[in-house]
Amino acid sequence: MQRLACVLIWLFLLEEQAFEIPANEYSEFAGYSNLVELAPDKFPFVQENRRYQRSLPEESGEMTDNVDQVTLYSYKVQSTITSRMATTIIQSKLVNNSPQSQNVVFDVQIPKGAFISNFTMTVNGITFTSTIREKTVGRALYSQARAKGKTAGWVRSRTLDMENFNTEVNIPPGAKVQFELHYQEMKWRKLGSYEHKIHLQPGRLAKHLEVNVWIVELQGMRFLHVPDTFEGHFQGVPVISKGQKKSHVSFKPTVAQQRKCPNCTYTAVDGELVVMYDVNREEKVGELEVFNGYFVHFFAPENLDPIPKNILFVIDVSGSMWGIKMKQTVEAMKTILDDLRTEDQFSVVDFNHNVRTWRNDLVSATKTQITDAKRYIEKIQPSGGTNINEALLRAIFILNEASNLGMLNPDSVSLIVLVSDGDPTVGELKLSKIQKNVKQNIQDNISLFSLGIGFDVDYDFLKRLSNENRGIAQRIYGNRDTSSQLKKFYNQVSTPLLRNVQFNYPQASVTDVTQNSFHNYFGGSEIVVAGKYDPSKLAEVQSIITATSTNTELVLETLSQMDDLEDFLSKDKHADPNFTKKLWAYLTINQLLAERSLAPTAAIKRKITKTILQMSLDHHIVTPLTAMVIENEAGDERMLADSPPQDHSCCSGALYYGTKVASASIPSWASPSPTPVMAMLAVGANRLESTPPPHVIRVENDPHFIIYLPKSQKNICFNIDSEPGKILSLVSDPESGILVNGQLIGAKKAENGKLRTYFGKLGFYFQKEDMKIEISTENITLINGSSTTSLFWSDTAHLGNQRVLISVKKGKSVTLTLNKEMFFSVLLHHVWKKHPVNVDFLGIYLPPTNKFSPSAHGLLGQFMNKPNIHIFNERPGKDPEKPEASMEVKGHKLTVTRGLQKDYRTDIAFGTDVPCWFVHNSGKGFIDGHYKDYLVPQLYSFLKRP
């Protein structure tokens, strides 16, 4: 993204080239002593005129040259954050108490990546407002006014991690001036939290100083923290109010608290107020927020095992790295190497005019190898030139060769991290040629990250290089903080959790989707995708996410209703109803700017340029193609906010640069062909549902068992009366390597002297696939070898590999598919949380077509061999509605009772009555042995048979 360095310096000089502001033409500011809380983007005395722009001078100074003569009456900042979209308004009111005219400067810092949306200045009742024009038009208007002596100077400059907005006005004695600046930015998640910074530098004591930060997050607030950034001076001043979905931070120091010391006349308010927070994430599918024709999809899954990584560090050791840069880089690398996981592989390439490698091949991150690599790095002595081309090609060769020779874990990710402080001086010098060489040689499973130290390096080149090869670039400032900056960046990419993440929105009425395909997802971050939809054609927006975790393929589905947010947004005055539109525009324009820098032909670049220009004008955003013209009502006095050539990529603060791909539906492996057994329950989305078969083997509450015996076409039922915590063997088939066990939970209290029990947890073990699956009433956990993946009942998702598929239907059911021929279905039974007795429990269903080995056993497994039964002598029972009969089975003659049991597959709330013959005494005589023979010690223990 183009960093807009817009510095407005307005010089209202009382000389020939400037216009004067008459002292007798101003009006009093109404409500001067009242700092009232207002709705987002609404402040007094200002014409609402939303526009975008940015600016950047080198330094920020005090509000005026004469501190004693000008009073800062109020300095007020308000930020409102709605679902990561922040709008900040800075308002300053000053009074000239001097008998002479005074220059007053409004100089504020805003975060890089922010868009200025409006600037308004009121001096002596004359109001200056802003409009967005195409850049050449804006410059022409500025030039016309300048020729008449009716403008100020036009200055463009850069700063470090902040951008400056600066304007100056000369006001007559007794005059009052008000400045107001609006800017917007998106909050990117880094290392597990969002960080909102407000730079406070009023330059003098303010009679009224007030900062309010309102945060509205629909997912709910997980934590909120305001670190001490003023060295304890304002301890206890910030007031934090944390709610479930809305929080407030206020900072209102009195004049006495603002003083640097008790008798000081200068302010201690000079720094950043920082607010850190994170949101709840109950659904692995992410949060899909849909409103007013736009949608935004936030995706930050947790509880996933890290994917092993193959990482090559490519370090510039040329002469320009001498001193503090090299020392800080070495210190950072030592810490980074210690943080590598044992399953990672790594090596180090260092280069000046020559290229060296610590190891010619990737090695495992053992303690011995890490210690040796740290010794190697400590001995580096910077000298010579910079051969970036050969260093990158060497690193690419090492990874390519390891991949071609099968030395890399197929489930791993490959990363190259380049650290350099300058442009090439040796070897290939042409940047476009280096970019082409890297693109031609790097495999499409490798991500290239570039860290540019200082300002001597061509940062725009590094960003093109990384964006084109599935990575990002970041500037590192060459100072004593270099080490922590390097370590912080590494921490952001140190934990890959998913590969090949793709967001699909298959509905035809969903359009203009931002980048929706990403090479990797890293823990602690967040992927954000936005788009448009036609509310007249859609009642809901469907999302399907496909991704790969450790040894597992994922398909995550969600549906979001159109009216879910309307009621909430309309009732909260601090919630921005346009947040979805603003987020979509922010992402789209920044991604287009990055695509423009990578455009392979002039024609493509012109097309992208045209799109950016139109969007910039439509959404009032100052980009490299537009400018902000600020003028009075007559239009004869103007100043210009322009954007100088500056670093740009997508998107400032983002960890991902993705691509756009066409949306697809659920992949074929996640939607097996419907069969009679597949119909045990609906899998995935509604369109995948099919009709359940009439006959399956199932276990529900009590727990009661319903066994369908196809030879006799009878349903046989029995209950098991055991204790909470006991684990029962349901299927134990060591020959096939299949196990199903269930752990009992009890009701909240006994009824009629009996405590009812239910299945609260089920364990499935597929030994040949080395896969264990634990399903509880809370979540679903897949353990595949050494990796663990968790899903929640709040997800609709598919997870699996070529042999095992887990399909979760939100809040209802889980289906396990083994080798596309064996099926296991689990239903979740929810009860009212405040029910005095009942608890949530699970039901399990097995189709009789599952093909176990002849040695299969367990309370359910033994009936897969379909024993013969004979029911005769049907007669009236003690209850006229429940007749009795005699049943011969396995050499036993039993008395059974005709009754009804519930089948919850088609009606999970009330169930469907199923007629069956009930066997008393915990199935004695119908099952082999006693039910206690089926107790096992662990959830994944096979049944030991005599």
Curated annotation (Swiss-Prot):
The keyword Secreted applies. Residues 19-54, 703-946 form a propeptide. I-alpha-I plasma protease inhibitors are assembled from one or two heavy chains (HC) and one light chain, bikunin. Inter-alpha-inhibitor (I-alpha-I) is composed of ITIH1/HC1, ITIH2/HC2 and bikunin. Residues 1-18 form the signal peptide. InterPro entries: ITI_HC_C, ITIH, VIT, VWF_A, vWFA_dom_sf. It comes from the Eukaryota. Residues 56-185 form the VIT domain. It is found in: Secreted. May act as a carrier of hyaluronan in serum or as a binding protein between hyaluronan and other matrix protein, including those on cell surfaces in tissues to regulate the localization, synthesis and degradation of hyaluronan which are essential to cells undergoing biological processes. This is Inter-alpha-trypsin inhibitor heavy chain H2. Glycans are attached at N118, N263, N445, N578. The modification Aspartate 1-(chondroitin 4-sulfate)-ester is found at D702. Residues 308-468 form the VWFA domain. GO terms for molecular function: serine-type endopeptidase inhibitor activity. Keywords: Gamma-carboxyglutamic acid, Glycoprotein, Phosphoprotein, Protease inhibitor, Proteoglycan, Secreted, Serine protease inhibitor, Signal. Heavy chains are linked to bikunin via chondroitin 4-sulfate esterified to the alpha-carboxyl of the C-terminal aspartate after propeptide cleavage. Phosphorylated by FAM20C in the extracellular medium. The modification 4-carboxyglutamate is found at E282, E283. One of its GO terms (cellular component) is extracellular region. GO terms for biological process: hyaluronan metabolic process. SMART domains: VIT, VWA. The modification Phosphoserine is found at S60, S466, S886. The keyword Chaperone does not apply. Belongs to the ITIH family.
